[in-house]
Each structure stands twice: as structure tokens, then as C-alpha cells.
């Protein structure tokens, strides 16, 4: 495959990493405006399976891998696909690839960016797992057709790992990122991410292996509201989260851990919250706060450690 590439960031570009609440000197809502990413890419689950055990949710209590009901897999994927269409989010559905059983979790392979000049860039991941890293070119090829140019990190190594929108999340409508590290993404890589995205990055060390990505313990609802599970974060991380989000809503371990996976919810438009069904407590809180909760069954995908947010990539 031959791809057009974005220019490499220069050393003149500023890097701004925010590691604690004291370093957050301005309100993130005052950051430069950015468009909302209101298009979804999804990968068809043709080759989805639980066979590459890379997170704790893939195993049952006895240590064996979860078995999937493949009819339910297709039904649940289609329900999520159709739920996006129903709320006005167009979906680009691409084929999975044989030998890549986790490619359906397409939030992880790339970070879509609109730079200060309006150019659409796709920052490609250096994924922790070899099989998952082999998915990256297929996602890249799909978004090149959507007028994206590619941007690359330094060569993949144990020091340069980055799992994109599994760990790196935009504050909606703002040039401001939240970045998780510790399990799949390395802290140092955010110097490069900040440069190429032309955005400050608030950093969060993830300390609970059951919440291996930032998107498993934090769901950003809008620019002042988020839901989060506290045991995934350090105390400084929680203080920083509370400073960024005036309305930070806690999620219990029961609903955040599998099979609830509530913090892997997705609110694409500041109104509709797509979330695994049955999370009674957090769903009630969100409804009382004025959000429209769309409950969906994703339990077959949770057997592999992902739910709504993992199953799509939002792009501009």
C-alpha cells in the first residue's frame, strides 16, 4: 500500500503536557475551537473472536476463554450500527480481515485530527500487541479514501506505544486531549501526540489492569460532563479529572467492570448516550441530567473487553 503522508512535526511546535491539576492553568473549554467528529467508522465482525487473550475480560473465572454466540455477535453489531444511523451519525462499515479477531474494536488503530489549518490528519498507532498492530494499515487505507493524510509516530518500540482513541480522547469541540498511559500507551509518546495534534494533553496514569484503556474507565459526555470509575486512576489523576469536568459523575465498580462496561459508553452529539444495557444506576443519573440514554446489548463484545466506544472510530 502507498499512502500520502502528513509532514513530520518540527521541533518548533510546542508541546504541552498537563500532569496534574496545578498545571491546568486555563479552563479547557476556552481552548481553540475544533469541529466535532460526527462520522463513524465500524468494522464488520466477520472474523471477530476471542482467541488472542490480551486483557482480563477475555477469560472466564476458571481461566478459559469466553465462547461467542456468533448469531448474537452479528445482531448486536447491527443494532449499534443502526443506532448511530437513527441519531443522525453516518457509518462507514468496512470489512474485517482474517487472522485479526479484534479489528472490530476500531477505536484503537488511529487518531483523527483536524489541524489548525483545517487539514485532516490520521495519526497511526503503535499498538502494544503484534496481531493488533497489523490492523493499522487497513484502517489507514479506509480513511485515506475520506481525504485524510497520514502522520506517523517514531518507530514502534516498547518506548513509543500508542493506542489512539483507546487512550487518547478529544474534549468535544475543543483543541484539547486527554491521554491515558500505563498499560497500552507509553507516557513519553504524548510529547509527539501533542505536537502533531497541535493540542495540549492532560495525562492520566491508569493503575487498574481491568481498565487497560482510558476509554474503559472514562466516557466524555460533553465539554463539562463525564462519567468515570475512580479505581482506574491515581489521586492526582482524579483531581485533574475533576478540574477538567465540573460535572464528573462516578460509576460504581459493578457497572464499570465487565459485564457492565458502562464507562465505554459513547455520546457523539452531546445528547444521546449509547451504552451497554442494564447499567441501571448510571443510566438513571444520566437521564435525570437530561441526556437521552440509548441502551444496547454488547455483551458478546464485552467478552473480549470492549463495548460501544471500542466498536467505532469517530472521524471528521
Stretches with model-predicted labels:
Residues 1-316:
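The feature marks the mature, well-folded catalytic cores of soluble enzymes
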Amino acid at each position: 500500500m502507498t499512502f500520502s503522508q502528513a509532514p513530520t512535526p518540527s521541533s518548533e511546535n510546542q508541546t504541552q503536557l498537563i500532569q496534574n491539576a496545578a498545571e491546568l492553568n486555563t479552563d479547557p473549554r476556552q481552548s481553540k475551537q475544533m469541529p466535532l467528529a460526527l462520522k463513524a467508522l465500524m468494522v464488520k465482525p466477520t472474523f471477530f473472536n476471542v482467541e488472542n487473550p490480551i486483557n482480563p475480560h477475555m477469560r472466564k473465572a476458571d481461566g478459559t476463554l469466553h465462547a461467542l454466540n456468533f448469531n448474537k455477535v452479528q445482531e448486536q453489531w447491527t443494532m449499534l450500527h443502526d443506532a448511530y444511523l437513527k441519531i443522525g451519525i453516518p457509518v462507514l462499515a468496512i470489512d474485517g480481515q482474517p487472522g485479526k479477531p479484534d479489528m472490530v474494536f476500531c477505536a484503537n488503530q488511529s487518531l483523527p485530527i483536524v489541524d489548525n489549518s483545517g487539514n485532516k490528519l490520521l495519526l497511526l498507532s503503535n499498538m502494544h500487541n503484534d496481531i493488533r498492530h497489523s490492523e493499522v494499515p487497513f484502517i489507514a487505507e479506509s480513511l485515506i479514501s475520506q481525504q485524510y493524510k497520514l502522520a506517523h509516530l517514531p518507530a514502534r518500540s516498547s518506548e513509543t506505544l500508542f493506542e489512539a482513541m483507546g487512550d487518547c480522547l478529544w474534549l468535544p469541540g475543543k483543541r484539547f486531549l486527554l491521554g491515558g498511559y500505563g498499560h497500552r500507551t507509553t507516557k513519553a509518546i504524548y510529547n509527539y501526540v501533542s505536537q502533531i495534534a497541535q493540542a495540549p494533553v492532560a495525562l492520566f496514569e491508569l493503575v487498574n489492569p481491568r481498565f487497560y484503556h482510558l476509554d474503559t474507565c472514562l466516557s466524555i459526555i460533553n465539554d463539562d460532563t463525564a462519567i468515570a470509575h475512580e479505581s482506574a486512576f491515581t489521586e492526582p489523576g482524579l483531581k485533574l479529572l475533576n478540574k477538567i469536568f465540573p460535572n464528573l459523575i462516578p460509576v460504581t465498580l459493578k457497572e464499570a467492570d465487565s459485564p457492565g462496561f458502562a464507562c465505554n459508553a459513547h455520546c457523539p452529539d452531546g445528547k444521546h448516550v449509547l451504552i451497554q444495557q442494564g447499567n441501571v444506576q448510571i443510566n438513571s443519573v444520566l437521564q435525570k441530567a437530561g441526556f437521552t440514554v440509548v441502551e444496547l446489548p454488547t455483551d458478546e463484545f464485552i467478552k473480549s473487553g470492549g463495548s460501544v466506544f471500542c466498536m467505532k472510530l469517530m472521524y471528521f
